[in-house]
Amino acid sequence: MTTTATAAELGSRPVPPLGGFSFTVLKLEIRRLLRNRRTVIFALVTPSIFFLLFGLNAAYANESAGKGNVSAFILISMALYGSVLATTSGGAMISIERAQGWTRQLRLTPLSPLAYVVTKMLTSMVLGFVSVLAVYIVGFATHKPSMPGYLWIVTALCVWIGSLVFAPFGLFLGYLLPTENVMQFMGFIMILLAFGGGLFVPLSQYPHTLQVLAKFTPLYGVNQLVHWPLTGGSMDMWWVVNAVAWLAIFTVGAIWRFRKDTARV
């Protein structure tokens, strides 16, 4: 059977419900991800260390910040960094599957590009949840962050949901970059985005031009939204527009690269 004949058969194959999305496949993907100890440990340890370094500083940790203190503000920031790092890392692991030829084999199945991207995004979100939980446990154990009890839950959920924006970004990088370089590039890119979105340094300390440019970066909207329950004030709809727009851009990019990669079968 020729490749052309196979492609013709695939084209006439009926599309299954939900584009081939399967909870069985989702469970397998989650297990595969959690077995990667290096990625899991990196996602858990890095943001927790950052919080311990910056969130416990006696010079400012107890200063007021909205409904809590600065330590609580930094806790949310580091949890967000860890969560987006985890979801991006989980997605970027697709580069390993590409090297093994797995994604090309998927072209022989009825699984749609959107269903595959959604499966990978949900898998990455599991790692993101574990990362958020780890940072919040460390923060709670130090007794330094101060905010109302309900905000511990609300902000943690906001951080986790907000990290969804970066799940398809990891997939996009995994399809775009070579296997041997994807993690190095990803780490560098995430640090730049964190600074650009005001995650490590308050945007108020940036020059005016950088403050304006920051509003168009991928982490800006999510960063503002996850801190809003703590800081209060009026919500800027641009935060939502920014987050939704980048989620759409990254998702379209991931689907495009998936189709381009599997089209080589």
Where is each model-derived feature located?
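Short, intrinsically disordered terminal tails adjacent to the first/last structured region
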Residues: M1-S12
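Transmembrane helix-boundary elements of multi-pass transport/secretion proteins
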Residues: L10-Q100, G128, V132, K144-T155, ...
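Short amphipathic alpha-helical coupling elements at transmembrane boundaries
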Residues: T24, L28-R32, R104-L108, G174, ...
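Transmembrane helix segments
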Residues: L53-Y60, G174-F216, Y220
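Transmembrane helix-loop junction
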Residues: G55-A59, I96, G139-F140, K144, ...
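Helix-loop-helix units of permease transmembrane domains in multi-pass membrane transporters
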Residues: M93-M125
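Alpha-helical transmembrane segments and their short interhelical loops
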Residues: P113-G187, G233-V244, A248-I255
